[in-house]
Amino acid sequence: MTSKISYIKFIREDIRHRSWLAVFSALVLFLAMPVYSAIYIDGMKGAQTVPGNTSAFITQNIRAIFPGLINGQNAMIVCYIIFLLAVLCAATGYGHIHSREKLDFYHSLPLRRMQWFSISYLSGILIFLIPYLINSFLIIAIGNMNGILNSALAVSSLIAVLGGCLVFLLIYTTCVLAMTLTGRTVTALLAGVFLIVSPLFILTTIESLEQEFFAAYYAPPGKAFFVNLSELLSPLGLSSKLLTCTGTYFPASAGSELTGITLPELLIPLAAGIIMTVLFLILSAVLYRKYPSEAAGNALAFPRSAPVLKVLACIPGAFIITDMIHAFTGMSLEKWFFPLSILTVLILTLFVEYIYRMDLRAIWRGWKSTLISIAGVAAIVSVLQFDLIGYDSYMPDEDNVARISILPDSFSNYFIYPSEYGPDSEIYLGFYVPEEDTALACSLAETGLRNAENGIEVPNTWEYSESESSDEKYMKTLFRFQLDSGRVIYRQYPLNREQLVPAVRSLLENKEFRKTIYPVFQLNRDDVYSINFSDSYQVPVELNLTDEQRSQLLDAYEQDLLAADASTLTEGTAIGSLEINIYDPFQPGTEALQNGMTADSVLGSPNLVGLSGFDLYPEYTNTLEFLENLGYTLRTEIDPEDVENLSITLSLDSVQSAKYSELFRTLPDGSASFTQYSTGEDVRTSDPEAIRLILDAIPPSRTELLDFSEDGGDSMEIEYKDGAGIGYYF
């Protein structure tokens, strides 16, 4: 039996044989960690000379990025070095198994295989771990010398050290597994890349193909199942997740939550990283123990696994490559996806056979696994192209729907909410309708499903059918079905104005639903920093209001909004709008600002969020009278005498179709200049009569709640005599 002293001796001897790697590890980590961090922090402190940047603001920013300097989250060179050292430690520690002479020599010594495995594994860890820990604590010391270290940052830094170590162990163990699976260094490198990268690409490609082939598919940002799974089942995805979570500053005021990251979001990746590392370590040890001496020099250590590994690699590889080609070229999926996938899998299988045998004449010997790979690709493509799983045709039974939400695309452009930028915001998922309107929303979803089945496609947000009539244009609408079982299903369907407007109008008859979707009812008035007002001139003017007047204005607006007819909200023409600026509750310094400190003493300037969706209609008498009493009169049209000049930029399509030629013929002679370009035409005028005629024909537009209008690629810029100006597409 080998004693502990002997183990230490063997580990030291192994490190001595790899002394170049130990020196390299110490040098690059020293340069990339304490040296880089000292320079970076000094550079950030020098930013205090910039007007508005206070010492407190700079310190706060340094603390926010400081943990990421330790684990590589905010210093990518450290991340790359961790990966590189993991590969080198595995390759140098287990390279002997790829040489028959070295393998026979090692196994002739009075040590069991598992003892050699443990010695190589531990020495590789120490080559990285010792310099990494030393340099990590040097960074923490630099932070302390610069006066930024506090107890919360110290804890965050230790978590970052843990994250960096775990990422190294994960990648290192994965590479060790690749070494024990293969018999040559080249194939070990390919196997390592495959093990580290392929799960991430496979799972994200599944998500991509679902989006490409299923018209009704929708995955909420941050909640895509296969993307989230890739962050836990892929060494690369999990490493990225670990660096992000552990490289975050954990302020004491956050209590049990990180800045934008909850405690479970930290613990789950840590647990997943430990579990994956342990599983790969056990598998590597088992393979090392069974590693045949004759495997050295062969492509694979266990030849019987070759066909299985070939199929498992080539089928997903074909889809990954084909999907990437589609992303870069925009090729037609219906025409090219099947033949290109078959061609790709054929090339991959032949390439793998060549790697196995290193003989071009023998690449057809594995024809059975090649046929299986081709058949597998053909079957999967058929499922996708013909929707054999019935994804697009599936509609939950209304009796099984506990509640349903609806979100037309235009809502996302019309409203901005106080909670929209929060880490847990679900505003982008839609608004649950009142229980009594569940049947109405389900019926609307069924209408959208029928539209999709009839071939109506709306590929992306704000893309419409080619019909000239806005009544025949279709808008994507997201439906979220929460079933009685608790399961949540997302689908998006195309709906036109005739179908969508009456349904939304009916929903808005319910006052509680209005309170749900309009941001004024979600507003914490203590967060309001300022209110801007704009009329037909569309130039925002900050209202000079006391706190009491601000509250009275919001009261009047809420009263008008609840009293308005639903048709006004869905089909009315706004004559003005309000914009409410609030302190951003998800940015540092907001709490201090609200507690009475000036913006300059905290951040240099306030962190604000501008909220939209506060249109003014002629029926809003309380709000309009309140503004008029304060001296803010709403102008319903632009006076040409107030305009200094007006310019129109027409797209090439508009020029070639003579879309506005009739309008331009009515302009007074010589009142406008026309300049043609290869991409279109510019029209400029400062003549009041020409300006009046143009504005009558093309008035400044406002975004509507249900906006089916389509920007034609033409734009207008208006410069007023007071120096203000606006620009918009029409």
Which residues does each PLM region occupy?
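Secretory targeting signals
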Residues: P67-G68, A75, L122-G183, T187, ...
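Junction motif at the cytosolic side of a transmembrane helix
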Residues: T2-K4, D14, F280-C314, I347-G366
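Terminal transmembrane helical anchor/hairpin motif
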Residues: Y40-L69, F201-L287, P292-A301, F319-P339, ...
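Helix-loop-helix units of permease transmembrane domains in multi-pass membrane transporters
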Residues: Y94-L126, P292, A296-G297, T546-A566, ...
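Internal/C-terminal transmembrane anchor helices
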Residues: K310-I320, L350-D392
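Function-determining sites in protein domains
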Residues: R365-I374, V383-F730
